[in-house]
Design a protein with these regions (language model features):
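N-terminal Rossmann-like NAD(P)+-binding domain of SDR-like oxidoreductases, especially those catalyzing
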Residues: 1-127
Length: 127
């Protein structure tokens, strides 16, 4: 089974990758992350220990998504969960839409092309 984890270096993505590896299922895991958050580099090193092949890129960029290997399942853990969007001066509402909507659409289109399954973990922004 080939699994692609987006947001692999984030809190949820890295924990999921570790759990899959610990289950001993023999799944081939590819992680995809923009490495933009604090702690991403630490998680990157940890993922390598679990056999996750990490690809650096941006799911908002179609060419980055197109360069990813085919998968049987895509688990979309990538998101910008900022509840302070627009208020913190660092994250705009547009950036949230690009990450959380356009990026997800790119992954859904990849699933359709490859006939892969899809799991969306979503964000705290769905309330």
């Amino acid at each position: 089974m080939k699994v692609l984890l987006t947001g692999a270096c984030g809190f949820v993505g890295s924990a999921l990758a570790e759990a899959i590896a610990a289950a001993g299922l023999g799944w081939e895991m590819t992680g995809f992350d923009n490495l933009g958050r604090p702690g991403s580099e630490l998680n990157r090193r940890r993922l390598a220990q679990f056999g996750v092949k990490l690809r650096h890129g941006d799911l908002r960029c179609q060419s980055d998504v197109d360069a990813l290997p085919a998968a049987d399942w895509i688990v979309d853990c990538a998101a910008n969960p900022s509840v302070l969007a627009g208020a913190d001066g660092q994250t705009s509402s547009r950036q949230l839409m690009e990450h959380n909507l356009i990026g997800t659409l790119h992954m859904l289109e990849k699933c359709k092309r490859e006939q892969a399954g899809f799991i969306l973990l979503s964000t705290s922004r769905v309330y």
